[in-house]
Amino acid sequence: MNARVGVFGGTFDPVHHAHLRMARAFADELALDEVRLIPAGQPYHRLEGPHASAAQRLDMVKLAIAADARLAVDEREIRRARPAYTVDTLRELRAELGDAAELWFLIGGDSLAALSSWKDWRKLFRLANLAVAMRPGFDPAALPPEVFQEWQARQVSDFSNRTASGTIRPLALPPLDLSATRLRARLAADEPVDGLIDPAVLAYIRRQRLYR
C-alpha cells in the first residue's frame, strides 16, 4: 500500500494539547500512516515573529510527540534560510515520497478563504490533497469565487477513490479551542496550565524561562 502522510504546519509557540488532539484526529479520520508536524521558520505572513526561538519550538514539538509513533517532526522550514512557502514544502515532500504516496495538507477554514493569496496556490492541488478543518458555521459558498470553484470541482466526502493529490476533504476535527496567545499569558502570570500542555514541554519552558 502506498504511504499516506499528513502535513500539519504551525508556529507551535508553544505546542499544546489542542495541537496534539487535532493531529491525532487528522490521522484517525484519514487513516494516515504518519502526520508530520512542521514548525514554521520565520512566518512571512505575520508581522510579529515567534516568542520562542526556532530551536526551542522544535525542541518542544519533539518532546510533545515523543510517545506517539504516528506523529513526527519535520525540520525543513526551521532549517530553511529563506521564507518558507507551503508550495515549496509540499514540492520537496512530493519529491521525497514519490508520485504514488497519498499526501494530505491540513488547512483551517480561515486559511482556505485566503488561499488565493498564497504563492502558486493552484499548484498545491498537483502536489497534495487538502484536508479542511471545519469550524461550526463554515460556509463554502462564502469562499472567494476562485477558491469556491476549486472546492466545487475537488471536494470529496468519502474514500471510494483515494488519490495521491488533487482533492479537498472537509473534516470535523476537534477545534483548536486553546490559543497559544492565551497559553503564553497564563504561563507569564504563573497561572495553572494543567491539562493544557504536555508535562515535558512545561518542564522545558520552565528550564528555559520562556514566555516570562
UniProtKB/Swiss-Prot annotation:
Parts forming coiled coils: none
Disulphide linkage map: none
Gene Ontology biological-process entries: NAD biosynthetic process
Record Gene3D superfamilies: HUPs
Catalyzed reactions per annotation: nicotinate beta-D-ribonucleotide + ATP + H(+) = deamido-NAD(+) + diphosphate
InterPro entries in alphabetical order: Cyt_trans-like, NadD/NMNAT, Rossmann-like_a/b/a_fold
Pfam annotation, one family: CTP_transf_like
Alphabetically ordered keywords of this record: ATP-binding, NAD, Nucleotide-binding, Nucleotidyltransferase, Pyridine nucleotide biosynthesis, Transferase
Keyword Nucleotide-binding: yes
EC number(s) stated in the UniProt entry for this protein: 2.7.7.18
Pathway(s) of this molecule: Cofactor biosynthesis; NAD(+) biosynthesis; deamido-NAD(+) from nicotinate D-ribonucleotide: step 1/1
One Gene Ontology MF term: ATP binding
Family designation: Belongs to the NadD family.
Function: Catalyzes the reversible adenylation of nicotinate mononucleotide (NaMN) to nicotinic acid adenine dinucleotide (NaAD).
Protein name: Probable nicotinate-nucleotide adenylyltransferase
Protein species of origin: Chromobacterium violaceum (strain ATCC 12472 / DSM 30191 / JCM 1249 / CCUG 213 / NBRC 12614 / NCIMB 9131 / NCTC 9757 / MK)
